[in-house]
Design a protein with these regions (language model features):
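Conserved catalytic core of nucleic-acid polymerases
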Residues: 437-439, 493, 605-606, 610-613, ...
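Short hydrophobic beta-strand that contains or immediately precedes a catalytic carboxylate
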Residues: 6-7, 129-131, 323-325, 392-393, ...
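Catalytic palm active-site di-aspartate
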Residues: 394, 484-493, 499, 655, ...
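Acidic, glycine-rich two-metal-ion catalytic cores of nucleic acid-processing enzymes
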Residues: 341, 532-697, 763-832, 847-851
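Conserved RNase H-like, two-metal-ion catalytic cores of nucleic-acid enzymes
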Residues: 4-5, 9, 15-54, 70-71, ...
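Conserved "right-hand" nucleotidyltransferase catalytic core of DNA-directed polymerases
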Residues: 230, 234-353, 371-372, 433-630, ...
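Active-site-proximal helix-loop-helix substrate-binding element of RNase H-like nuclease domains
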Residues: 153-181, 300, 334-469, 480, ...
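Extended two-metal-dependent nuclease catalytic cores across DNA- and RNA-processing enzymes
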Residues: 21-25, 74-250
Length: 877
């Protein structure tokens, strides 16, 4: 039998909206419901191997049910705006995929689905109805299956119902299912039902009497008496409810199976939507169909003749703007892509007289023209001798500044966002092949990819600069982000040395401690078990030894860190478990993990990323050296394995309380500024003023609490969050925060102004003009809006601190090189810089660090730096 899939459009879209976390694309469009809908659709189609597909939607106009009962669906809350804006978008996507959209004035989508399903079943089709509404179970039949999907965090499970499945779960047939609903009513649709009859009584009555008509025929026998009385009194409501709940299966719907025939969902038009909405995983389904592009046709010319290449390079030098990409990986250059005119790009592969050094040299020359745009400058620097004096425009970094919320800034992203073009990505064209392999095995696709890269860099350069200027970020781009590329490359190239033998010894020490903790936990619980198994751990803690306060989930007890941390003060075994987890993580992440990153030179060369975080902070990967533990003694000891070269030491310089100092400056709060100007203990002063006690009487606990408030305020902490951090009541936390704002009133005014500005403008800015969009403030969800308010308060402060450390990094690195010193900046961890310092250069490096870090920004309070040295990172910190 051929298969027809029918979808309840609004129902599935609504379910997807609440099942998938909030998503927006670079245009600011909410996309989570559409994304979830498509995932559900493709999951069902993959499993069904359907031949026909159609989607039914409700209209806003009244239906025949409203004529029967004015209050029908009258209790429903309005659709959230974030979902409402996705309904027309969903219809556009389906239309682009060639899927028929069905609506009918005066009828609901359920009626359309019921009519078509029953009709086509009679014609010999196998029908699947996809809906989030259990009311459709009444349509279940021999050849009609009802699929109810459940989506959680983007993962979908589908529950299937034929008549026997309905009977098994609800004890009634599909026909009787609606009789039950007529008795019990339906609050979501405002179907009244019979007052005082709930689901259990309704089910029992229908099981016993089969239907509503038969119940009334035997009303004298009905028990309990309360139900009998209600049925007598509210017969009209029962009859009305049955009519409202029953799906119409003979609606006047014009529908042709030929229109619903599944030919090709993966159309070029649909692919453009997937790219626009930034659904990369869904776009990947389009396979060969997506190897097209929208926009003017471009020519991508492969140039293998040396003389022709030389002439083109000379011509490019005279152009007003150049777009380039050096295709180089794994230490070797494959080709150079170049564009200097709208018609297309030239690709120069390595070969013959065009050696790697020749190609890299030409790239370097063109970069020095001062008007070259590339996609990823840092990636090319191992092959080109460029540095701070060379102005090369990086399109990826520019695109990041314009929208730091995206997860990628590839040429296909930039083409879509800046040029309005849909082009295939690298993965679309050469899959996972390296550039060298792609040129050898897929030369046509490689040439096309390279040409698109160069053209995108060329064409996007002008609009990128114009938008940066319009948004007030051109100076930030030129003076901080572009020079930073060189700084980060220098740090990556230098790396940091790791002693393998000490790393191995550290691992053994951890393993011994883990074994001790494991034995202690077993002894305290009276049983050997797998401590790493949440299921076993939950059963031991909350059932066997009966610890109070456990949270039961569908899969067992929650043993998440936040649950255990609340219980740890009262249960020593839980503190042991938390320690055990810390040590096992240290062992896997660092003792075992770091060794895989040590190269032949004995050093780890981590990657530093400047286009990852929304606030502007630099991140570190492969491995993440910014996440080295500092709270546990054994965690801090991992820093001992990081060592300088012979004849060198480490100098570590750390900004002291930089975010609080930025807060004092940006808020202009006189008391906070004065506290820093007098170089007093800011946390003790806050405790003294908040708790109204003399400074010399502040206790260590009060200072700790004041410190939590000080730093919490920077992150927009709520009373609930502070109460959790300090293990105090929410009322006490509210009092702390209120007193803090009484003490520093301009801080409150400043933070409120940030939120107000973000609500009005949609973004906040740092002291240096960096923008951070805050789309969460537009959400109809309270939790999302609250998160948005915290982001609005914190981002200008954290982002300004990030800008300051970037300025310091650039100046320190550039000055070390300018003064021909052997010492090198090798690591940045949030507010901390680590310099591998020649022993005979210690004094001058300390002077450079002090001067450049102090003068990185001019604040109303002085920037303070703590500096230490040592023979390893542990000693220097």
């Amino acid at each position: 039998m051929e298969k027809l899939v029918l979808i309840d459009g609004h129902s599935i879209l609504n379910r997807a909206f609440y099942g998938v976390p909030n998503l927006t694309n670079s245009e600011g469009l909410h996309t989570n419901a559409v994304y979830g809908f498509l995932n559900i659709l493709f999951k069902v189609l993959d499993e069904e191997k359907a031949d026909y597909l159609a989607v039914a939607f409700d209209l806003k106009t009244p239906t025949f049910r409203h004529k029967m009962f004015d209050a029908y669906k009258g209790t429903r809350k309005p659709m959230p705006e974030e979902l409402h804006e996705q309904v027309p978008l969903m219809k556009e996507v389906l239309t682009a995929m060639g899927v028929p959209i069905l609506t009918k004035e005066g009828y609901e989508a359920d009626d359309i689905l019921g009519t078509i399903a029953k009709r086509e079943q009679k014609e010999g089709y196998e029908v699947t109805i996809l809906s989030g509404d259990r009311d459709l179970l009444q349509l279940s039949d021999t050849h009609i299956r009802i699929c109810l999907p459940k989506t959680s965090r983007g993962t979908t499970e589908v529950h299937n119902y034929y008549p026997e499945d309905v009977i098994r779960e609800y004890q009634v047939t599909p026909e009787q299912f609606i009789e039950v609903k007529a008795l019990m009513g339906d609050q979501s649709d405002n179907i009244p039902g019979v007052p005082s009859i709930g689901e259990k009584t309704a089910t029992n009555l229908i099981v016993q009497y089969q239907n509503l008509e038969n119940i009334y025929a035997h009303l004298d026998e009905v028990k309990p008496p309360r139900a009998k009385k209600a049925l007598e009194e509210y017969k009209d409501l029962a009859d009305l409810s049955l009519k409202l709940a029953r799906i119409c299966i003979d609606a006047p719907i014009e529908f042709s199976m030929a229109d619903a025939k599944l030919e090709n969902l993966y159309t070029p038009e649909a692919y453009e939507y997937m790219k626009r909405l930034e659904f990369k995983s869904i776009a990947a389904r389009f396979g060969e169909e997506i190897k097209h592009e929208s926009g003017p046709e471009k020519q991508f010319v492969l140039v293998e003749d040396f003389s022709e290449a030389d002439a083109l390079f000379e011509k490019a030098k005279k152009a007003d703007r150049i777009g380039m990409e050096l295709l180089a990986e794994n230490g070797s250059v494959t080709a150079l892509a170049l564009c200097f005119e709208e018609t297309g790009s030239y690709i120069f592969p390595v070969g013959g007289f065009m050696t790697e050094s020749y190609i890299a040299g030409k790239y370097e020359e063109l970069c020095r023209t001062g008007h070259a745009w590339v996609l990823d400058l840092k990636h090319s620097l191992p092959f080109a001798d460029l540095s701070y004096g060379d102005t090369v425009y990086d399109a990826g970094v520019a695109a990041y500044l314009l929208n730091p919320l995206k997860d990628s800034y590839g040429y296909d992203d930039i083409a879509r966002d800046l040029l309005g073009m849909t082009v295939p990505s690298r993965a679309d064209l050469i899959k996972k092949l390296s550039c060298e392999d792609a040129y050898a095995k897929e030369p046509e696709n490689f040439t096309r990819m390279a040409g698109l890269m160069a053209y995108t860099a060329f064409a996007a350069g002008k609009p990128l600069l114009e938008r940066l200027t319009a948004d007030g970020m051109e100076e930030l781009y030129r003076t901080i982000e572009l020079p930073l590329i060189y700084t980060l490359f220098h740090m990556e190239a230098e790396g940091i040395a790791v002693r393998r033998e000490e790393l191995a010894a550290y691992g053994e020490k951890l393993k011994r401690q883990i074994a001790v903790l494991e034995k202690e936990i077993w002894e305290m619980t009276g049983q050997e078990f797998n401590i790493n198994s949440p299921k076993q751990l939950g059963e031991i803690l909350f059932e066997k030894i009966q610890i109070k306060g456990g949270k039961k989930t569908k899969t067992g007890y929650s043993t998440a860190a936040d649950v255990l941390e609340k219980l740890a003060p009262n249960y020593p075994v839980i503190q042991k478990i938390l320690d055990y987890r810390q040590y096992t993580k240290l062992n896997s992440t660092y003792a075992d993990g770091l060794g895989t990153y040590i190269r032949e030179d004995g050093r780890i060369h981590s990657r530093f990323n400047q286009t990852i975080t929304a606030t502007g902070r630099i991140s570190s990967t492969e491995p993440n050296l910014q996440n080295i533990p500092i709270r546990m003694e054994l965690g801090r000891e991992i820093r001992k394995v990081f060592v300088p070269r012979d004849g060198f030491i480490f100098l570590d310089a750390d900004y002291s309380q930089i975010e609080l100092r930025v807060l004092a400056h940006m808020s202009g709060d006189e008391r906070l500024i004065e506290a820093y100007k007098t170089a007093q203990d800011i946390h003790a002063i806050t405790a003294s003023q908040v708790f109204h006690i003399p400074l010399d009487e502040v206790t260590p606990l009060q200072r700790r609490n004041a410190k939590a408030v000080n730093f919490g305020i920077v992150y927009g902490i709520s009373a609930f969050g502070l109460s959790e951090d300090l293990s105090i009541s929410r009322k006490e936390a509210m009092d702390y925060i209120a007193r803090y704002f009484e003490t520093y009133p301009q801080v409150k005014t400043f933070l409120d102004s940030l939120v107000a500005h973000a609500k009005e403008q949609g973004y906040v800015t740092t002291m240096f003009g960096r923008r951070r969009p805050v789309p969460e403030l537009k959400s109809s969800n309270f939790m999302q809006r609250s998160f948005g308010e915290r982001v609005a308060m914190n981002s200008p402060i954290q982002g300004t601190a990030a800008d300051i450390i970037k300025i310091a990094m650039i100046r320190v690195d550039e000055r070390l090189r300018r003064e021909n010193l052997r010492s090198r900046l090798i690591l940045q961890v949030h507010d901390e810089l680590l310099v591998e310092t020649a022993e005979d250069e210690k004094e001058i490096v300390m002077k450079i660090l002090s001067e450049e870090m102090h003068h990185a920004a001019s604040l109303k309070v002085e920037l303070e730096i703590d500096m230490h040295d040592g023979k390893n990172w542990f000693e220097a910190k």
